């Protein structure tokens, strides 16, 4: 798949993870709804599903891996930042086919698109520290 298809998959996965965090609904139901509501012709659908379901299944482990690198408890983070850190942590830990620099850069871009003003700086700082523990 083209890098653009993966970026679109990450964007959709971020939206699914955010929705899952807010609603508590089953991630499979959220994935299905996202696929119905969006034009998926230029999205790596399998990658989207892997990211969204992978985060939902492994979120506790991902949160624990990132938490030591935070200045406040994970559950006090902004919901968007929480979703971005979970998504990127999943990529770093479970998707070794994705170079760590790509995973971090894509997360920074997501933070610029969806996060607060300096969210991208925060995400970058946390991931720069956490990558050593996530990617062994």
Curated annotation (Swiss-Prot):
Domain of life: Bacteria
InterPro entries membership: NusB-like_sf (IPR035926), NusB_fam (IPR011605), NusB_RsmB_TIM44 (IPR006027)
Record GO biological process: DNA-templated transcription termination; transcription antitermination
A family per Pfam: NusB
CC per GO annotation: cytosol
GO molecular function ontology, one term from the record: RNA binding
Keyword terms of this UniProt record: RNA-binding, Transcription, Transcription antitermination, Transcription regulation
Described purpose of this protein according to its UniProt entry: Involved in transcription antitermination. Required for transcription of ribosomal RNA (rRNA) genes. Binds specifically to the boxA antiterminator sequence of the ribosomal RNA (rrn) operons.
HAMAP family, sorted: NusB
Family: Belongs to the NusB family.
Protein name per Swiss-Prot or TrEMBL: Transcription antitermination protein NusB
Organism: Pseudoalteromonas translucida (strain TAC 125)
